[in-house]
Amino acid sequence: MQLDKKIINHVHCLGIGGIGVSALAEILLKKGCRVTGSDVSPNKNTERLQRLGAEIIFNHDGTAITQADCAVYSSAIGATNPELMAAKQAKIPLLKRGEMLANLMKEYQSIAVAGAHGKTTTSGMLSHAFVEANLDPTFMVGGVLNNSQTPARVGNGHYFIAEADESDASFLFMHPDIAVVTNIDADHLSTYDGDFNRLKQTYIQFLEQTAQDGVVVLCLDDPILREIAPLLSRRVITYGFSSDAQYRVVDYCQQGIQSLFQIHSPQRKAPLTVKLSMPGQHNALNATAVTAIADVVQMNEPALLKSLADFPGVDRRFTIRGEMILPKGNALIIEDYGHHPNEIKATLAAARAAWPERRMVLVFQPHRYSRTRDLMTEFVSVLAETDWLVLLEVYSAGEMPIPGADGMALIKMMSNGMAQKTTFVPLLQNLPETLQKLSQPNDIIILQGAGNIGSIVTALVQTHG
């Protein structure tokens, strides 16, 4: 559907408390639209939007939608949702979240960041760089930036930076001027009928929708992207640790939770020395993608380097929450949103490099029964890399339980040695008591997952710390 700004004054957002829809609602509000919305319960996102003027009700009975010019919904909204059904009955135009986003991006020079892992941090880092360089961008990312405490911004500049979502294939609504893909992995396969090749072909279609004179930026360390790169008709810029990448990371080292490295590129005679206030080789890759894009738009180099050095990160991405007080010392609490085996692996590697002598306690809440089923072997392998595992029950994210894909099924797949250093906690509210009993002074406790595991942070840090 084509968005006609002349007649769209009132937008209703279903599931307005979700990070993606809330970010879109914030942009619409700041562009002068009347925004109404609904969700099942209030959260930080709805509170932020209400302060900006959004009118929100906390039910889905279908009564709030009938006066809107159009309605926006995400893939989390099911076909039987009363508001969705009411909108159809009232013949109110319905747009998917990604469709509305793509319509808004048409007004700008657009940059879309896609990938299975790292797209939120990369798009957030890129947005921060554009702000620091006084390019006054509009942006919409999939997480709350720690410095601005918002996932969205409306600027007066020419650029719109957005996270592109492959989980529901809605990135196909986009036709960006610059497209970035950080990696491709076997996730959200239910959208693609379980066919990884179809997922790969959809990425190719997305990249080929980049403007004819546009640029595609790909991580050459990813074997699928390496395979795809020569197939594309657009100009391709590559980055990575790989020796044949155009933007190449060299001399990477981690000092505590900071990263230092150099970037060799065809744009420069001398390597670019980069410092990040965040750990992990994956973040060095994210910063290198940002550097490649900065060169495309001819960003001021000192502004770029400053922005990379002072980028404070995105909420729930290796976020240090505080300390839990124990009888004989403290344990450090870190929260990370990663919910795929490769993301967990990157988090553990960064934590090990930062605190090599300290015991790692991983508290993992699996996200979706389908993902747990599809990646069971990979989860078992990566979870074995921690010193002690506290396993929570699967966060369903609206899915019905799948036999053999719950927390106990994961434990049954583990080796005897790993099972002996695993504690299963079926109820999240019992986690603080469990951690008090098993934690040791100087432990690093990582709360890992995309579900509601973060809701327990306050209890851990304030009640026990």
From Swiss-Prot:
Its EC number is 6.3.2.8. It catalyses: UDP-N-acetyl-alpha-D-muramate + L-alanine + ATP = UDP-N-acetyl-alpha-D-muramoyl-L-alanine + ADP + phosphate + H(+). One of its GO terms (biological process) is cell wall organization. The keyword Cell wall biogenesis/degradation applies. It is found in: Cytoplasm. GO terms for molecular function: ATP binding; UDP-N-acetylmuramate-L-alanine ligase activity. Keywords: ATP-binding, Cell cycle, Cell division, Cell shape, Cell wall biogenesis/degradation, Cytoplasm, Ligase, Nucleotide-binding, Peptidoglycan synthesis. Gene3D superfamilies: Mur ligase, C-terminal domain, Mur-like, catalytic domain, NAD(P)-binding Rossmann-like Domain. It is an enzyme of class 6 (ligase). Pathway: Cell wall biogenesis; peptidoglycan biosynthesis. Cell wall formation. PANTHER family: UDP-N-ACETYLMURAMATE--L-ALANINE LIGASE, UDP-N-ACETYLMURAMATE--L-ALANINE LIGASE-RELATED. HAMAP family: MurC. This is UDP-N-acetylmuramate--L-alanine ligase. It comes from Coxiella burnetii (strain RSA 493 / Nine Mile phase I).
